[in-house]
Amino acid sequence: MRGSSKIYEWLRAAMLAGPIVLAPLDAVLADCKPDHFRPLFFIKSMGACAFDSETLSFAGTPAEQATCLMRGMDSSRNLEPRLQGLPHALAERVGKTNGLPLRATLSDYLPMLGLEGELGDFLWLPVSRAHDNDLAAPMARYFVIHDTSGPNFGRRSFPDDIDGGGKVNDLRNFECHDGWGKAHVVISRTGELLLVHDYSTPWRETKFEQAAEFGGALKGLFLHNEMIQPRRSAPGRGRRNDARSPDPPFTAAQYDRIALLYVIASVRAEHWLIPAFHAAIDAQIPNGHDDPLNFNIDNFANSLDAVMAKLGTPDQVQAAHQ
């Protein structure tokens, strides 16, 4: 897992002993905090899924919220219709508190994947809370899935190695030494992870969360997960559009990792979080996003089932130790 223990220790040592240089990528020590004033941003509605600022949730049951929030954009960049239902792996879990694996089980499992690093170190901490970690506010409810929407190759073909090594999957491109990385976690197409912020850190990435109407109320309510997806321009959409994704849009390794992260985040929240797409959250905001483009919900559900099969249910784990 890139950006876990080693990177953390390097950066901590740097703060104590002075600056370090990790050449040749300037991005490793890039400043990511905006260097210009951002005016207040106002929204005209509570979004396509009807957010309630009093309850800090979208309309409906958790499962109903997921059918609204797990929608992408169609070819005309309009939000797709609400899902008719959720795959069984999600329908039986979203919003519920039962069926979560034990933290100890996850702690034993992560080293098998080489992911003990910060994922294991912080496993015993809760997730963030709304209102910038106000202890009286609700814990994070939404597990937001994004894609990086880049690099954009324009009219050029995708490189042959986009699902392997190469610059596209170099997670150092997403490291920020000033602590202003966009998401909590970034997932490469090979399944490597970069932990940018732990899930206990309140963070905002969507325009909706940053709207002036909310102040800081939504900071900590959403957990953000970026999946690397390069783009190309599609014919008839303007010279610099990024409307084409690779084939496959996301790799099996990415689905496996996003499912694992969903399990980890839900265990730490002590309830199954509500999955959401960036596109649906910002759907009614000008210049909103289309990500995660062509995300396959069934693949995500299948990976979730596979992860849970490896972890077992709490009852199965207890029975195995009797």
Name every feature range the model reports, one short phrase each.
Residues 105-269:
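Active-site-adjacent loop/helix surface patches within enzyme catalytic domains
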Residues 23-24, 196:
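Extended interaction regions within the primary functional domain
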Residues 2-3, 8, 27-109, 223, ...:
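Basic/polar, cationic surfaces and motifs that engage anionic cell-wall
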Residues 6-7, 15, 190:
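Serine/proline-rich low-complexity intrinsically disordered segments, especially terminal tails, linkers
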Residues 12-23:
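Bacterial N-terminal signal peptides
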